[in-house]
Amino acid sequence: MVDEIAGPLASAAELAGAAILQDQKLLSIGLGPDCASATVFASLLHQGVLRERPALPVVEIAAHQIESVNVGVGWAGQRIQALGQPGDVGFIFAALLSHADIQRLSQTAEQRQMQLVWFGNRGPGLNINANDEEIETRVALNMTLAICAARLIDIHTFGPMEGSK
């Protein structure tokens, strides 16, 4: 599984780094159980990972309590429509999303000319997932991937930490 996610995770870090260096922003999107992954990802990018550095431009679009996934996807789509700009990159933690939900979010992002990175499910753009796993495993894996992605974006954007080899 590590080999399957290493390449796409590195590509996601490069995509995010390029967007940041071009004064674009990242959107961290998660609903229900995936909200925690989106929150951790955004927080680590705001505060830095193990070092002081400028906060990165990341917008958190996350809701813990949603009436239904359908309502949550509608709300997230509205936020993407309002906040997304051409060249922005959306990191979507999508373990619970259906194919129809993924299509709705991807269409909204496409209208805003954004690129997407999907965690825990398959969608248009970069995919970092374990789709064959149980939902609980995908949600837990998304949390780990959120931390790894934030760390890789930090290194890609600011270089390795002093004293690290």
Regions from the language model: what does each represent?
Residues 1-22:
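A short, well-structured juxtamembrane/interface segment
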Residues 22-23, 86:
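Structured helix-beta-strand junction loops
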Residues 31-163:
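Glycine-rich phosphate-binding loops that contact phosphosugars or nucleotide phosphates
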Residues 23-24, 113:
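Glycine-centered short loops/turns at secondary-structure junctions
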